[in-house]
Amino acid sequence: MKTIIEDCTYVMGRGTIVIVELPDELLEYVGDFTYASKVKVGDKVKINSKEYVIKGIEKISTSKFVGLIIGGDDVDNIDNFFGKEIEI
């Protein structure tokens, strides 16, 4: 599945966090306008033709948006991630 990176930030000690809106195919509706991600820690994503392992997932309220933590200092310059396509 492909989607667009909405935002990106680096958090010291946690890694690079990319904010994406997950497609419906990667979500499970659990009720009360709340969704659970089918994407799991350890899954791989591809950004700019480079693969990264998901090291953590941050849920953002009850929306379809999640923050994927994809690594530490080994991640490319995050400025290259804004608005880019991510393959999950």
Report each predicted region and the residues it spans:
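Beta-strand/loop-dominated core regions that host nucleotide or nucleotide-derived cofactor-binding catalytic loops
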Residues: 2-15, 19-88
